Curated annotation (Swiss-Prot):
Endpoints of the signal sequence: 1-21
Keyword terms: Carbohydrate metabolism, Cytoplasmic vesicle, Disulfide bond, Glycoprotein, Glycosidase, Hydrolase, Metal-binding, Signal
GO cellular component, one term: membrane
Pathway where this protein functions: Protein modification; protein glycosylation
Cofactor: Ca(2+); Mg(2+)
Active site: E377 (proton donor)
Intrachain disulfide bonds: C334-C363
UniProt protein name: Mannosyl-oligosaccharide alpha-1,2-mannosidase 1B
Enzyme Commission designation: 3.2.1.113
Enzymatic class: hydrolase
Statement: the UniProt record of this protein carries the keyword Signal: yes
Length: 513
């Protein structure tokens, strides 16, 4: 999950015709659409795309946070610590690319997390940096222990994880224990916010608990779980309009909710995601988290499931506020099918699995209905506000586009991956391949992958000159794993998962293994 703002200025937008500036699949690019492709050749093509993005980042942007893949410049939106490198680590490990893994490990050992000139997001830093390092540690100390010969390089991952958490933990020093998100780590200050968001507060427990379990220092788990406690027992009771579904903002001073706006959209999403994932991580300690997820899932099926009038066969999730349903959704929200599938298979609930597959199909429709084969940043099925130019799209597809951007988000491919792993049905791998191929077609540049301004323009519109680090962590990983061999980190049907993925797709070893 990532906050819904695109965070893209006009200066980051390169106005260029992709057909002219970036011919699709020149002589150096793999052809991805051959009907004779085997599972192995698809896996190899995805690995090649990952290496293409890494090579461009290494040449033009490393050790900065991200590549600007149109201008071949760089950005430091994540504090200048090398976000793309740390986010790429677990994917490079899973792909068994020892060269890239060692390059990243060498970099991690040099990071000084106590120094930055920009505001630090507790949430983003936790899911990208802390999650990335802990995942690399768990993989390289566990099922991929043969990849790196120098064990001290691996040990640095845990040392640096602790160093980072020690820099960040003052965020929780509030009257309630609900943390500030936007931090000045130099002064020990914050932005003075009165509230924190549901997802920002509720997407910390997995990484901080894992750090405690690995180090034996319970401080980190205690801090994150204290913050979570207010979400698990929401006050006032009016903040929970349906069982398990809670408001969007929490007062930092007293831990009380300040609203009862309910959704699975950006800003709320990964709170629900982590409820069931904490149970997968340790069912003995986190039974309450599971109970709250089950309540939320049942309420979602009953109260938020929505079917467009033009396509009643489709299922999307509405939002809810004071008796009114909001008939709009986001690319970010499309993780929801994967969450229902994970919960359904772990808890042996076929109703959750079937509903999850319905959500996956709805999100597939947002990809399958555009000219690029990539889904939009946001969309709606509210018939009171359909633009005349999109009436035909709504009649055919069941939605219309409210923001046509694509910034390399992973959530649709992520849910396709869960559908494949839970059902074993080849359809979902085909959907992953189609989505990955579309990204490779329309987003690929000479040095990496760029975002698009309009997924329903024949050429994807213009280019956003930014390559988010989650391209490495999520899009490439979920795509690759669908065509890779079974392994300890892969999602398993039933309750046999040895790893669980954080919201940035970094797999951490579950507590009991």
């Amino acid at each position: 999950m990532h906050l819904p703002s695109l965070s893209l200025s006009l200066t980051a937008l390169a106005i260029a015709s992709p057909s002219a500036a970036y011919p699709h699949f020149g002589s150096s690019q793999p052809v991805l659409h051959s009907s004779s492709d085997t599972t192995q050749s698809r896996a190899d093509a995805i690995k090649a795309a990952f290496s293409h993005a890494w090579d461009g980042y290494l040449q033009y942007a490393f050790p900065h946070d991200e590549l600007h893949p149109v201008s071949n410049g760089y950005g430091d939106s994540r504090n200048g610590w090398g976000a793309s490198a740390v986010d790429a680590l677990s994917t490079a490990v899973i792909m068994r690319n020892a060269t890239i893994v060692n390059q990243i490990l060498d970099h991690v050992g040099k990071i000084d997390y106590s120094k930055t000139n920009t505001t630090v997001s507790l949430f983003e830093t936790t899911i990208r940096y802390l999650g990335g390092m802990l995942s690399g540690y768990d993989l390289l100390k566990g099922p991929v222990s043969d990849l790196v010969q120098n064990s001290s390089k691996i040990d640095v991952l845990l040392t640096q994880s602790k160093n980072l958490a020690d820099v960040l933990k003052f965020a929780f020093d509030t009257p309630s224990g609900v943390p500030y998100n936007n931090l000045n780590i130099t002064s020990g200050g914050n932005d003075g916010a009165k509230t924190n968001g549901l997802a920002v507060t509720g997407t910390l427990a997995l990484e901080w608990t894992r750090l405690s379990d690995l180090t034996g220092d319970t401080t980190y788990a205690d801090l994150s779980q204290k913050a979570e406690s207010y979400l698990l027992n929401p006050q006032p009771k009016s903040a929970e309009p349906f069982p398990g579904l809670v408001g969007s903002n929490i007062n930092i001073s007293n831990g009380q909710f300040t609203d009862a706006q309910v959704s699975w959209n950006g800003g709320d999403d990964s709170y629900y995601e982590y409820l069931i994932k904490m149970y997968v991580y340790d069912p003995k300690r986190f039974g309450l988290y599971k109970d709250r997820w089950v309540a939320a899932a049942q309420s979602t099926m009953q109260h938020l499931a929505s079917h467009p009038s033009s396509r009643p066969d489709l299922t999307f999730l509405a939002s809810y506020n004071n008796g009114t349903l909001g008939l709009s959704s986001q690319h970010l929200t499309c993780f929801d099918g994967g969450s229902f599938l994970l919960g359904g298979t772990v808890l042996n609930r076929t109703d959750f699995i079937n509903f999850g597959l319905d959500l996956v199909s709805g999100c597939h429709d947002t990809y399958n209905s555009t000219l690029t084969g990539i889904g939009p940043e946001s969309f709606s099925w509210d018939t009171s506000d359909i633009p005349s130019s999109q009436q035909s799209l709504y009649e055919k597809a069941g939605f219309y586009i409210t923001s046509g951007a694509y910034i390399l988000r992973p959530e649709v491919i992520e849910s396709f991956y869960y559908a494949w792993r839970v059902t074993g049905q080849e359809t979902y791998r085909d959907w992953i391949w189609s989505a990955f191929s579309a990204v490779n077609d329309y987003c690929r540049t000479s040095s990496g992958f760029s975002g698009l301004t309009d997924v329903n323009a024949a050429n994807g519109g213009s280019r956003y000159d930014n390559q988010e680090s989650f391209l490495f962590a999520e899009v490439m990983k979920y795509s690759y794993m669908a065509f890779a061999e079974d392994a300890a980190w892969q999602v398993q049907p039933g309750s046999g998962n040895q790893f669980v993925f954080n919201t940035e797709a970094h797999p951490v070893r579950v507590s009991s293994t």
